[in-house]
Amino acid sequence: MSETFDVDVLVHATHRASPFHDKAKTLVERFLAGPGLVYLLWPVALGYLRVVTHPTLLGAPLAPEVAVENIEQFTSRPHVRQVGEANGFWPVYRRVADPVKPRGNLVPDAHLVALMRHHGIATIWSHDRDFRKFEGIRIRDPFSG
């Protein structure tokens, strides 16, 4: 089964004050351990860097080099594929976005779903309920229940 994760999972795994920290950290450790195929979407990696280094979003932002090292834990694993837009992405995005008509904060979610479809990724781990607006993907909430 091919799977990926949203920015929130990485942020909660890093942010020790988060009520979801333990669950997120356990999930990230499972992804890092392998051997199952995991996809790191470039917008997720960059979104993580944006959030965890921002001086006002978290109580104690990470130094940029620490945040980059966290991402490199994924990029150094042979079972983790790093993917982004490729030729033919725009028509895939349109097929994902047109039925939902995303605006505002839903646009990045449509972007991730289009990347998933473009690369054949079936499942995304996220607490973001907006992913339910898109058909054809499986959403796993690591923090429910």
UniProtKB/Swiss-Prot annotation:
Spell out the Gene3D superfamilies in the cross-references: 5'-nuclease (3.40.50.1010)
Highest taxon above the source species = Bacteria
Gene Ontology MF term list: magnesium ion binding; RNA nuclease activity
Tell me which Gene Ontology terms the entry assigns under biological process.
negative regulation of growth
Please state every residue range assigned to the domain named PINc.
Answer: 15-141
Q: Which InterPro entries match?
A: Mtu_PIN, PIN-like_dom_sf, PIN_dom, VapC_family
Cofactor(s) essential for the protein: Mg(2+)
Q: Which family does it belong to?
A: Belongs to the PINc/VapC protein family.
Q: What name does the UniProt record give this protein? A: Ribonuclease VapC48
Q: Which organism is it from?
A: Mycobacterium tuberculosis (strain CDC 1551 / Oshkosh)
